């Protein structure tokens, strides 16, 4: 067969490809670039902490005693979904680890996050501030008018924190006023994403249609999702490492 010059692939790999193989790569170039940008990882590498005391009481994987932490008249299990998502991203991509409670304490230290009995959940601005101090390239977005734009963003991202509500669409999430979840590992062949849902131990760590997520984005919120596209160890001001809870 006719050979083409050495071609650089993702992860710094070089190889020589024949014409047919090269054509396959050209056809799937966008998919390969997205995989390279994410970095090589699969479901087994993804952290997916649970927030609730019921999961902890049942001894569920990914649950922890942070669910019973009491903060200003509110239990972590009632408001900790966003912090679980942030801890998931930090522990999956930084080479370090933290618990959701560690993330709570750090967010209180370095951002304007001030939980109250009425509102305990972390807001978008504080989430972005904390993730950037953790070394991540993080940006906030509003829901695009077309699904394809959202899909392309998710495809190329390392991970996404999304805010969903059953008031916008209840195909998947039921009786949910507002809830943060993580999505990652977009699958081109099925148009699905890997879901880390802090409030659903049975639905946690499953693939679901990305369209469900798009339709359920909470549109009354100022923002609907936070995209994480990169990580820099040098920019990580925290370097927390270890999960004690």
Regions found by a protein language model. Give the residues of each.
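Active-site-adjacent structural segments surrounding the nucleophilic cysteine of cysteine proteases
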Residues: 1-118, 239-245
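Conserved active-site-adjacent core of cysteine acyl-enzyme catalytic domains
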Residues: 5-8, 90-244
């Amino acid at each position: 067969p006719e050979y083409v010059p050495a071609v650089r692939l993702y992860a710094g790999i070089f190889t020589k490809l024949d014409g047919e193989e090269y054509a396959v790569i050209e056809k799937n170039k966008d998919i390969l670039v997205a995989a390279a940008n994410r970095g090589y990882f699969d479901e087994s590498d993804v952290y997916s902490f649970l927030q609730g005391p019921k999961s902890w009481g049942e001894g569920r994987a990914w649950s922890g005693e942070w669910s019973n932490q009491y903060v200003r008249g509110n239990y972590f299990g009632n408001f900790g979904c966003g912090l679980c998502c942030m801890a998931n991203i930090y522990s999956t991509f930084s080479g370090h680890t933290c618990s959701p409670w560690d993330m709570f304490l750090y967010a209180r230290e370095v951002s304007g996050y001030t939980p109250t009995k009425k509102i305990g959940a972390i807001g978008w601005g504080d989430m972005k501030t904390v993730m950037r101090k953790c070394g991540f390239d993080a940006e906030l977005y509003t829901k695009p008018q077309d699904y394809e734009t959202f899909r392309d963003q998710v495809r190329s991202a390392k991970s996404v924190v999304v805010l969903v509500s059953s008031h916008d669409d209840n195909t998947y999430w039921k009786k949910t006023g507002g809830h943060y979840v993580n999505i990652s590992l977009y699958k081109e062949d099925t148009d699905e994403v890997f879901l880390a849902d802090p409030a659903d131990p049975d639905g946690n760590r499953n693939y679901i249609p990305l369209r469900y997520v798009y339709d359920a984005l909470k549109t009354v919120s100022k923002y609907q999702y936070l995209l994480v596209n990169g990580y820099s160890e040098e920019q990580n001001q925290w370097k927390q490492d270890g999960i004690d809870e």
